[in-house]
């Protein structure tokens, strides 16, 4: 554990946002919580498909530090991780930014069972687990326009992801879309969806890690006006006819 934690803290020094060092202080307690999270992830991954990455150092860099980079872009207030899967980025953001209330939403109960164990083992406070499909949750008053920030990582192409997530963001709030280096193409295909959903791309940020050959992008999308009540549509319609 000690060697992994040292590696985490050293690699965190090499995390860069737009080429500049990302200010990512990680306390000893937070590092231990991330290690415990990783152990649970690997244990549960033996019986269910949570991650294709099984090397602890790959999990450190490609899951944990990638997820953590969005913490420098968070507004104050509540966070909803839509399609959280194994908890990326939501659990990592919660560990490193404990002051934020966090909702972890997923359509599969077995993933939420894993996340329940993680939250219990790490004694994470102010975390709500929600078993819902995003397109259904976005039409329910308890979730619609309720969050200061939504986040999502590698769930769907951006035009579809916008329809899933923007309805749950408060007017004036933001959506952080974690994407790969092909984001610019997705943004070009999303202009119609952005207009219909009442939002604009506020900024785009490149995430890199010294010594690693991957590059990820986070788009910060601002919700400027309430979403029309017809959105989100049913899943079949969203997939057949993306905005």
PLM regions with names:
Residues 54, 131-133, 205:
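Short loop/edge segments at beta-strand edges and connector loops
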Residues 97, 169-171:
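Helix-to-beta-strand junctions that scaffold the AdoMet/dcAdoMet cofactor pocket
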Residues 111-113, 183, 187:
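Short alpha-helix immediately C-terminal to the canonical SAM-binding loop
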Residues 135, 157, 180-184, 209:
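Short "lid" loop at the C-terminus of a central beta-strand within the Rossmann-like core
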Residues 172-182:
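Conserved beta-strand signature within the Rossmann-like core of class I S-adenosyl-L-methionine
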Residues 188-243:
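SAM/dcSAM-binding transferase cores
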């Amino acid at each position: 554990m000690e060697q992994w934690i040292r590696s985490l803290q050293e690699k965190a020094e090499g995390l860069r946002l737009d080429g500049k060092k990302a200010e990512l202080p990680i306390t000893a307690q937070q590092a231990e919580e991330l290690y415990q999270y990783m152990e649970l992830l690997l244990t549960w991954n033996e019986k269910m498909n949570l991650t294709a990455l099984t090397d602890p150092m790959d999990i450190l860099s490609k899951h944990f530090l990638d997820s953590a980079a969005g913490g420098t872009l968070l507004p104050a207030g509540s966070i909803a991780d839509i399609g959280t899967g194994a908890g990326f980025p939501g659990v990592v953001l919660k560990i490193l930014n404990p002051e934020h209330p966090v909702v972890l939403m997923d359509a599969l109960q077995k993933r939420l069972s894993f996340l329940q164990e993680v939250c219990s083992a790490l004694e994470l406070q102010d975390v709500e687990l929600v078993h819902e499909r995003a397109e259904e949750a976005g039409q329910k008053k308890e979730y619609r326009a309720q969050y200061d920030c939504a986040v999502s990582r590698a769930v769907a192409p951006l035009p579809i992801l916008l329809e899933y997530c923007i309805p749950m963001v408060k007017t004036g709030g933001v959506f952080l879309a974690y994407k790969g280096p092909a984001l610019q193409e997705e943004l070009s295909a999303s202009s119609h969806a952005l207009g219909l959903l009442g939002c604009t791309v506020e900024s785009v940020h490149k995430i890199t890690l010294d010594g690693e050959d991957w590059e990820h992008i986070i788009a910060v999308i601002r919700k400027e006006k309430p979403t029309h009540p017809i959105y989100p549509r049913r899943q079949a319609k969203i997939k057949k006819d993306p905005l």
